[in-house]
Amino acid sequence: MNSIWAWFAIASAAAVTAATAQNLGGDVKSFYELKTTYLDGKPADLAAFQGKVTLVVNVASKCGFTPQYEGLEKLHREMSGKPFEVLGFPSNDFGGQEPGTAAEIAAFCQRTYSVDFPMFAKVVTKAAPDQSPIYKFLGASGHLPGWNFSKYVIDKEGRVTAFFPSAVKPDAPELRSAIQKALGE
């Protein structure tokens, strides 16, 4: 009887592993293999950022962390001229704090924080049937956002090298250090 349960446990684990690999896009090895949509509705091939270090952030307009847009824009401007980009992915997953349309999000970001870094269409970051492939890939690193303004450092090859929760601000020494390390500085 124990061998039947052992076989069942092994078969179940194999099925879960296979399903997880399939849900994560299976063969996706690099963030830069993924495609998505810009906030203005145009297609976005993340291969355009290959060779750069990127900071991927799930953002929201009505969150206590929303003022971090200012720090993200400052980081974006300070790092111009280096192979680095901040990428913003609006999400309504946490507290319904990004309820706006794409046009409303764009207007808010421009009017309030003069956001100039690339912004993408609203995504689902949480593990769910409609989770964005972007966040399926990022989640394979062992970290999914616990709230808005979670941050992932992606190296030039498209690998997640660091994760920072919402409370870590864009000017935090540990975040800046992780970016510099990914840049090879």
Regions found by a protein language model. Name each.
Residues 16-21:
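Sec/Tat signal peptide C-region and signal peptidase I cleavage site
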Residues 1-4:
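Positively charged n-region of N-terminal signal peptides that target proteins for export
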Residues 65-131:
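Structural microenvironment flanking redox-active thiols in thiol-disulfide oxidoreductases
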Residues 38, 58-62:
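Amphipathic alpha-helical repeat scaffolds
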Residues 6-15:
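Bacterial N-terminal signal peptides
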Residues 133-185:
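Thiol-/selenol-based redox modules, centered on thioredoxin-like
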Residues 22-47:
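N-terminal "domain-start" segment that seeds a small globular fold
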